[in-house]
Amino acid sequence: MSKKLANFAQKRWISCSSNSFNMYDPRVFREPVSNVQELRKPLDVDDERNFLFLKAMKSDATPVFYRDSVIDKLIRVCTKDGEKETSRKNVLSALEIIKRRQYKAWTKANDEEKKSIELDPFVIARKGIKNCHPLMKLQGVTRGGTTYQVPFPIEEPEAEFRAMKMMRDICRVRAKHGETHFKDILATELLAASQNEGSTITAKQELHKTCEANRAYAHYRA
């Protein structure tokens, strides 16, 4: 038995050793600093970063003025056929459209109305996506040869992804039918969703109604 186990281990199926091949030697490299305020601070004399190298910064962690984790995720969700740059251009153009529309409304409003108009498109986009978060999802469960659509609760990260996916699909369908460009539809949907309106909010409500109608199948979750 021990001989068979030794032969099995020699074939590299079992290994208790850590990977020693790493492009960033932990003795030489340190994590990069992505916070702009931290970058502006001078290093202490005894700071080890004066003598060591820094790892290459990830593309989604670069300290730029428009960096936002929710917007970055929306860009990834809207990417089609690997064209991430096109997706980024569409999403940022949608945010620019939101900014222009809100500023136009702000210039026409009186002093009292101006206080309630949000001009930051990132705040509007985050609020709109947050309002579209579904609380439940439908998942197929097979029992006795029959597949039932069973409602399941979902965690916050998945709810955010499903909200973005619903909004993306609605915008793509409307853009394909020639209503207008994707960026214009996305801007309209984000603005409407921030007010709990729009097609994505309607799709979320319909999903909740279906989950409520299928609650009799909830015992199939186990």
From Swiss-Prot:
GO terms for molecular function: mRNA binding; rRNA binding; structural constituent of ribosome. SUPFAM superfamilies: Ribosomal protein S7. Residues 1-14 form a transit peptide. InterPro entries: Ribosomal_uS7, Ribosomal_uS7_dom, Ribosomal_uS7_dom_sf. GO terms for cellular component: mitochondrial small ribosomal subunit; ribosome. Gene3D superfamilies: Ribosomal protein S7 domain (1.10.455.10). Component of the mitochondrial ribosome small subunit (28S) which comprises a 12S rRNA and about 30 distinct proteins. Belongs to the universal ribosomal protein uS7 family. This is Small ribosomal subunit protein uS7m. The lineage of its organism: Eukaryota, Metazoa, Ecdysozoa, Nematoda, Chromadorea. The gene is mrps-7.
